[in-house]
UniProtKB/Swiss-Prot annotation:
The gene is E4F1. SMART domains: ZnF_C2H2 (SM00355). The modification Phosphoserine is found at residue 50. Residues 184-263 are annotated as: Mediates dimerization, DNA-binding, transcription repression of CCNA2 and interaction with HMGA2. Ubiquitously expressed. It comes from Homo sapiens (Human). It catalyses: S-ubiquitinyl-[E2 ubiquitin-conjugating enzyme]-L-cysteine + [acceptor protein]-L-lysine = [E2 ubiquitin-conjugating enzyme]-L-cysteine + N(6)-ubiquitinyl-[acceptor protein]-L-lysine. This is Transcription factor E4F1. It is an enzyme of class 2 (transferase). Its main location: nucleus. Pfam families: zf-C2H2, zf-C2H2_6.
């Protein structure tokens, strides 16, 4: 139907006004009657005609002429050549007499579901006038003036609205015995359009049920709390809040919901389940058909047994049936049923769905209706799959009918039905991608897809990020980009426990735990676990380097490489060490700075001694040699004492040692702080000796304690080697100890770079000497 057919429903508040309107119309007063009031209900007007109804019989409501072609029927109505047929018998009820004021002909119901609205009287005069006017506007559409009697009656204490009020014009509800004014629109596709929210519906009955949502009447009252609702379904959903019933359960994470819509939002939300359950189910269901019909817990004598074992990947749909019980009501297994439509040859083999004792059924048809109703209530999407004849075999039953009731075979996981997206993705991955994008280096299988992709680079970008200003051509790309600004890592890997910002990152990371490499290189055939790794590798086969530096004209294949290169020109160092404040141009350099064995040494904390802090360390260099004891209770269980000794003459004539840090990592211990402080305040010519404290202090210090150029660190025997190695680490890996002034009695002029290998040699040699290039400072560590 080309135009739009508008059905305008006008209201009259009395039967006299209705009769007067009919008399003014003359011979064209009544064109058709769509419904007649009956004690048991209402007759209805057939749904609007569409292309699928061309083979149906179309009957004129005025002359009762029948047409098989829709075009002939419409032409017949426009010509106004038909005459009203002789009146037939109408149910003689006071309502019909008062409403119509004359005899009318009831219209036969159409092939579709009738519109269950009240009396509809078609006014031919208004029809002819509106048709001539609407043909110029909507191109041959039809506008009908119909009168709809209000079905709803006002309750006690409610007052009827005045004629023409917004409620009567928009909602179609009026007081008792009155009629409502509603504007019903039928578009060119034959679908009913709601005049308030512009939603479309297939039949008028669905539109009528939808119109209830725009009404203020709430006839369904909760008996527990007194809350009222417009529809019965809303009352049922509300009642679950009192009972805490959660019939809709997620098959991935096990979380239950009260409404099917909540489950659907859970599956489509930004925080869906991260883990898919790999299951291997073996369940025994013991139910007899007789007990299922009667709903009684009979003995096990006449029970049938069925066993079903399935193994495979779960299909991502919502469950229909959750629990399978035996004859005594004991839960045997929780079942997640995947409904699939079988071929005609397999319907005889498919067992019946399980039936709980709480819902006894009297026939096979009622059980199917219950299952179908449960699917509708739970929002199940029925996937159609063509099964093989040998894929399902009936399980043997003992002592009962050959078709056991509760075999959970509707899952059919062995078929492994893939969603359409997965099939398309698998087919697309098999096609070689030989058309790379010159701007982003992404590859495409055809030139057409490449051109469509290029429009994303050159076309308009109306969707901009509010935080960084980056624009995108589509909204979903902006939504995906906004995940970058989220700092919270809410998604955890079930295998290793790592946290990620998005679920897509978790899915990509999970391939690390498997040997699957689904992304092959179209050039060399090398396979990769992630698409990004495959794309990065593919760029190595390309000679193009589209990302050019603006300072030196050097080209790069990846944009990230260009960004890192530009930092060398600008001097930008965005990655700061949280301890020493040193900046780095690349994140990897910062990680290496934090991972090296020496620790971050640029920030040397001054160790102060106070009465309240017995664990603080200090280095005292005074005029007279002395000894300072420092406790470190956090290093080991026992208390260790560090004896530090030096002279004042050397301290007055020397300057502080400068430590040029190479690549050291953090060693968070008191030993490291003391050693750093010693090295920092040691002057030229000092010797640092590590000794055991196995006897009294005088014996432990030995002859080195009397030397004027010696700093002796006396430790317990268990920590001697540890302190010596820590001291060596403090001045190793590229570190140079240098003094700007001072004299030295040493004649050595060699530099020994300490590394892990040198420390191993130190354990065997017993002594290691490290001297500055000019021989200004000597550090000697002795392991006794």
């Amino acid at each position: 139907m080309e135009g739009a057919m508008a059905v305008r429903v006008t209201a009259a508040h009395t039967a006299e006004a209705q009769a007067e309107a009919g008399r003014e119309a003359g011979e064209g007063a009544v064109a058709a009657v769509a419904a007649a009031l009956a004690p048991s209900g209402f007759l209805g007007l057939p749904a609007p005609f569409s292309e699928e109804d061309e083979d149906d019989v179309h009957r004129c409501g005025r002359c009762q002429a029948e047409f098989t072609a829709l075009e002939d029927f419409v032409q017949h109505k426009i010509q106004k050549a038909c005459q009203r047929a002789p009146p037939e018998a109408l149910p003689a009820t006071p309502a019909t007499t008062a409403l119509l004021g004359q005899e009318v002909v009831p219209a036969a119901p159409g092939p579709e579901e009738p519109i269950t609205v009240a009396h509809i009287v078609v006014e031919a005069a208004s029809l002819a006038a509106d048709i001539s006017h609407a043909s110029d506007l909507v191109g041959g559409g039809h506008i009908k003036e119909v009168i709809v009697a209000a079905e709803a009656e006002l309750g006690d204490g409610e007052m009827a609205e005045a004629p023409g009020s917004p409620r009567q014009q928009g909602l179609g509800l009026a007081g008792e015995g009155e009629q409502a004014q509603v504007k019903l629109l039928v578009n060119k596709d034959g679908r009913y359009v709601c005049a308030l929210c512009h939603k479309t519906f297939k039949t008028g009955s669905i539109l009528k049920a939808h119109m209830v949502t725009h009404s203020s009447r709430k006839d369904h009252e909760c008996k527990l709390c007194g809350a009222s609702f417009r529809t019965k379904g809303s009352l049922i959903r509300h009642h679950r809040r009192h009972t805490d019933e959660r019939p809709y359960k997620c098959s991935k994470c096990g979380k239950s919901f009260r409404e099917s819509g909540a489950l659907t939002r859970h599956l489509k939300s930004l925080t869906p389940c991260t883990e898919k359950i790999r299951f291997s189910v073996s369940k025994d269901v013991v139910v007899s058909k007789e007990d299922a019909r009667a709903g009684s817990g009979a003995g096990a004598a006449g029970l049938g047994t069925a066993t079903s074992s399935v193994t495979g990947e779960p299909i991502e749909t919502s469950p229909v049936i959750h629990l399978v019980t035996d004859a005594k009501g004991t839960v045997i297994h929780e079942v997640h049923v995947q409904m699939q439509e079988l071929s005609l040859g397999m319907k005889a083999l498919a067992p019946e769905p399980p039936v709980s004792q709480e819902l006894p059924c009297s026939s096979e048809g009622s059980r199917e209706n219950l299952l179908h109703q449960a699917m509708q209530n739970s929002g199940i999407v029925l996937e159609r799959a063509a099964g093989e004849e040998g894929a399902l075999e009936p399980a043997p039953a003992a002592g009962s009918s050959p078709q056991p009731l509760a075999v959970a075979a509707p899952q059919l996981p062995v078929l492994e039905v893939q969603p359409l997206e997965t099939q398309v993705a698998s087919e697309a991955s098999a096609v070689p991608r030989t058309h790379p994008c010159p701007q982003c280096s992404e590859t495409f299988p055809t030139a057409a897809t490449l051109e469509a992709h290029k429009r994303g680079h050159t076309g308009p970008r109306p969707f901009a990020c509010a935080q960084c200003g980056k624009a995108f051509p589509k909204a979903y790309l902006l939504k995906k980009h906004q995940e970058v600004h989220v700092r919270e890592r809410r998604f955890r890997c079930g295998d290793c426990g790592k946290l990620y910002k998005t679920i897509a990152h978790v899915r990509g990371h999970r391939r690390v735990h498997s040997d699957e490499r689904p992304y092959p290189c179209p050039k060399c055939g090398k396979r990769y676990k992630t698409k990004n790794a495959q794309q990065v590798h593919f760029r190595t086969h390309l000679e193009e380097k589209p990302h050019v530096c603006q300072f030196c004209s050097r080209g790069f294949r990846e944009k990230g490489s260009l960004v890192r290169h530009v930092r060398h020109h600008t001097g930008e160092k965005p990655f700061k060490c949280y301890k020493c404040g040193r900046g780095f141009a690349e994140h990897g350099t910062l990680n290496r700075h934090l991972r090296t064995k020496g620790g971050c040494l640029l920030e040397v904390e001054e160790l102060l001694v106070s009465e309240d802090s017995p664990a603080a360390a200090t280095t005292v260099l005074t005029e007279d040699p002395h000894t300072v004891l420092v406790e470190f209770s956090s290093v080991v269980a026992d208390t260790q004492e560090y004896i530090i000794e030096a002279t004042a003459d050397d301290a007055e004539t020397s300057e502080a040692t400068e430590i040029i840090e190479g690549t050291q990592t953090e060693v968070d211990s008191h030993i490291m702080k003391v050693v750093q402080q010693i090295v920092h305040q040691a002057s030229a010519g000092h010797q640092i000796i590590v000794q055991n404290v196995t006897m009294d202090e005088e014996t432990a210090l030995g002859p080195e304690a009397a030397a004027a150029d010696t700093i002796t660190i006396a430790t317990p025997e268990s920590l001697t080697e540890q302190v010596a190695m820590t001291l060596a680490s403090a001045i190793s890996e590229g570190t140079v100890l240098a003094a700007r002034a001072g004299t030295s009695g040493t004649e050595q002029a060699t530099v020994t770079m300490v590394s892990s290998e040198d420390i191993e040699i130190l354990e065997h040699a017993g002594e290691l000497v490290i001297a500055s290039p000019e021989g200004q400072l000597e550090v000697q560590t002795v392991i006794v």
